[in-house]
């Protein structure tokens, strides 16, 4: 732990108090010898004079400049000497002569000044240390959340400021999103060489909005901009503007832009801007809440009456649909950069970046991993290689092999591996269910190719069948949707065909949900039914984002009944397609089930080779190479 004088002083405060009292006890008296010459009793000055005249005083010791005396008194009744303390008057010059005339031994003890000096020093230092400790204690409590000093800082911006950002990330570390990187590299060039653009009348963009699903590299791009630009950099989260007090959000926005103007040219990065930039409207909560005041102030600062030349705002969100239209217009966010999931070449570049510090076995191919992971984001790919490295270390291997890569992909997609099932009727039923999915998907031309079938439980699933879609396809046809419905019904069809209608299980619950959703979208959104080419889905918006409290139905009860009938018809059509394939291919289904129970996992290529011995396997648009 780092040493702190302030903490040491606070902890020493109780010791100072105790030490002060010990100090006072040691140097409290003006005369240290007075404590060693103690008296048994006290005697009045008048009685003392009487004893002097009577000859009962044998010795007198004077202390405190003659103000106090310790006298020895002889008592003939008990035949012993007593010591008594006498307080002497200030004006008694004849006393000394009187004592000498009576032949009484007289000693004078001078005052020791060192005790007074140390007492004075102790009395001075202790209050100073006490006041300093209390001051530091107050300062520390004021800096803590909820401390008394926080009331003065609520309106201050919480943005992290770096005069020369050291993020450790450069554009060379960002891979797989070349289009977005090119857009942002131009922003950096604007800041470094503005004359190139002003010479032809171009203006620097005021804002860039990074849009994309989670894990695609939006924040990483912002770090790269900060590392490359070489200008002051402010970073803040959208949720850090609004607090429990009214007006704090708007005040923090003003303070942020005030600091930015003082350090222009500079960059401001607002992460998760949807926390403060959601669209305004009635909805629930009214139209005058604290978030809207903060948004209004942000709109004014970005492009209001006063300019903010030299300030570029970069924001990131994965919810562009909820942002206010005034925030999205040119002049505030001039550019909207889409940061989407990478394609094959992008995934390959990302994997190469994250594999720099990984020790891969010679047989591991980055190209094969990239082809096997369509739809993976940059964060997913980084997690995949990290999981593979962890598995390698757990298994005490020196390099990451194909087995670790395969297990890591399964873990990222489906979750942790569970305990394998024991041989039983339940295991055989699950095997028929998974083979049913795979056989239907393999024999339907428009279905995605099978990647792997396994009985190893992962997550909530007791068995899994992976299909790898063709990532180059941006649109989906009706035939492909029907093939997916049939493939999803393949598990239930195999259960019915092999075990009978009374032995079907709840394992198809998720499949039926998926089938119903696809069929309903075909009817209500895509116009792929007998109802005709119309869209019947309402888009009233979410209630907390300014939408209505209740979505209004756009069609009559009669149309709703027809929609339900069409959904049921499409689902039943897919069910019959799957049932027919399972019936016709029962022999190969039984063989595949026996093989799956024996090996617990069959990869896609082996599965297709076995099916090809019994039926013609249609050529898919893309077959995924296996690792």
Curated annotation (Swiss-Prot):
The active site is at residue 434. Homohexamer (Potential). Part of a large (>500 kDa) complex that includes FtsH3 and PSII. Coimmunoprecipitates with YidC. Disruption phenotype: Cells have decreased chlorophyll content, with a 60% reduction in the content of photosystem I (PSI). The PSI that remains may have an altered structure. Cells grow normally under very low light (10 umol photons/m(2)/s) but are dramatically inhibited by low light at 40 umol photons/m(2)/s. Under this light intensity they also photobleach. Reduced rates of D1 processing and degradation are observed. Mutants show increased tolerance for non-ionic stress by maltose but also an increased sensitivity to high NaCl concentrations. This is ATP-dependent zinc metalloprotease FtsH 2. GO terms for cellular component: thylakoid membrane. Keywords: ATP-binding, Hydrolase, Membrane, Metal-binding, Metalloprotease, Nucleotide-binding, Protease, Thylakoid, Transmembrane, Transmembrane helix, Zinc. Induction: By UV-B light and oxidative stress provided by methyl viologen. It is found in: Cellular thylakoid membrane. InterPro entries: AAA+_ATPase (IPR003593), AAA_lid_3 (IPR041569), ATPase_AAA_core (IPR003959), ATPase_AAA_CS (IPR003960), FtsH (IPR005936), P-loop_NTPase (IPR027417), Pept_M41_FtsH_extracell (IPR011546), Peptidase_M41 (IPR000642). The chain crosses the membrane at residues 8-28, 118-138. It is a multi-pass membrane protein. In the central section; belongs to the AAA ATPase family. In the C-terminal section; belongs to the peptidase M41 family. One of its GO terms (molecular function) is ATP-dependent peptidase activity. The gene is ftsH2. Acts as a processive, ATP-dependent zinc metallopeptidase for both cytoplasmic and membrane proteins. Plays a role in the quality control of integral membrane proteins. SMART domains: AAA. Residues 1-7, 139-627 are cytoplasmic. Its main location: membrane.
């Amino acid at each position: 732990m780092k040493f702190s004088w302030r903490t040491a002083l606070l902890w020493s405060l109780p010791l100072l108090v105790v030490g002060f009292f010990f100090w006072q006890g040691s140097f409290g008296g003006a005369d240290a010898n007075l404590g060693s010459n103690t008296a048994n009793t006290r005697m009045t000055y008048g009685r003392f004079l009487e004893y002097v005249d009577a000859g009962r005083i044998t010795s007198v010791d004077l202390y405190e400049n003659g103000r106090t005396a310790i006298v020895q008194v002889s008592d003939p009744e008990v035949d012993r000497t007593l010591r008594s303390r006498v307080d002497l008057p200030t004006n008694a010059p004849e006393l000394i002569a009187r004592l000498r005339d009576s032949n009484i031994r007289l000693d004078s003890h001078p005052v020791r000044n060192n005790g007074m000096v140390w007492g004075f020093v102790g009395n001075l230092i202790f209050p100073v240390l006490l006041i300093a400790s209390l001051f530091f204690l107050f300062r520390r409590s004021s800096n803590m959340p909820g401390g008394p000093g926080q009331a003065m800082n609520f309106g201050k911006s919480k943005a992290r400021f770096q005069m020369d950002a050291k993020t450790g990330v450069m554009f060379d570390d960002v891979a797989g999103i070349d289009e977005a990187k090119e857009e942002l590299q131009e922003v950096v060039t604007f800041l470094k060489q503005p004359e190139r653009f002003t010479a032809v009348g171009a203006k620097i963009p005021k804002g860039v909005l990074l849009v994309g699903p989670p894990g695609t590299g939006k924040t990483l791009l912002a770090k790269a901009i900060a590392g490359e630009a070489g200008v002051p950099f402010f970073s803040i989260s959208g949720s850090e503007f609004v607090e429990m007090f009214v007006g704090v959000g708007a005040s923090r926005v003003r303070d942020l832009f005030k600091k930015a103007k003082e350090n222009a040219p500079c960059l401001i990065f607002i992460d998760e801007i949807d926390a403060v930039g959601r669209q305004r409207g009635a909805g629930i909560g009214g139209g005058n809440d604290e978030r809207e005041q903060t948004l209004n102030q942000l709109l004014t600062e970005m492009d209001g009456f006063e300019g903010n030349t030299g300030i570029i705002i970069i924001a990131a969100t994965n919810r562009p649909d909820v942002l206010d239209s005034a925030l999205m217009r040119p002049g505030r966010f001039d550019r909207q950069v889409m940061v989407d999931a990478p394609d094959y070449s992008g995934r390959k570049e990302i994997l190469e970046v994250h594999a720099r510090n990984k020790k891969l076995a010679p047989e591991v191919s980055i190209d094969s991993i990239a082809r096997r992971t369509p739809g993976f984001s940059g964060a997913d790919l980084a997690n995949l290689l990290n999981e593979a490295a962890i598995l390698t270390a757990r298994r005490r291997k020196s390099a990451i092999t194909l087995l670790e890569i395969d297990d890591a992909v399964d873990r990222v997609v489906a979750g942790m591996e569970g305990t394998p099932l024991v041989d039983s009727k339940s295991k055989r039923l699950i095997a028929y269910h998974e083979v049913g999915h795979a056989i239907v998907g393999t024999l339907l031309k428009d279905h995605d190719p099978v990647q792997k079938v396994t009985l190893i439980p992962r997550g909530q699933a007791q068995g899994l069948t992976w299909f790898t879609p063709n990532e180059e396809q941006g649109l989906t046809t009706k035939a492909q949707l029907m093939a997916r419905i049939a493939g999803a019904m393949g598990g239930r069809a195999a259960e019915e065909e092999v075990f009978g209608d009374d032995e079907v299980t709840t394992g198809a619950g998720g499949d039926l949900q998926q089938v119903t959703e696809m069929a309903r979208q075909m009817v209500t959104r895509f116009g792929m039914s007998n109802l005709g080419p119309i869209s019947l889905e309402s888009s009233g918006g979410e209630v907390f984002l300014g939408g209505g409290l209740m979505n209004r139905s756009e069609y009559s009860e009669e149309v709703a009944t027809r929609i339900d009938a069409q959904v049921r018809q499409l689902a039943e059509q897919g069910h019959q397609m799957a049932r027919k394939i399972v019936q016709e291919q029962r022999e190969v289904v039984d063989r595949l089930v026996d093989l799956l129970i024996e090996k617990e996992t069959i990869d896609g290529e082996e599965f297709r080779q076995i099916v090809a011995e019994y039926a013609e396997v249609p050529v898919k648009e893309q077959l995924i190479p296996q690792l």
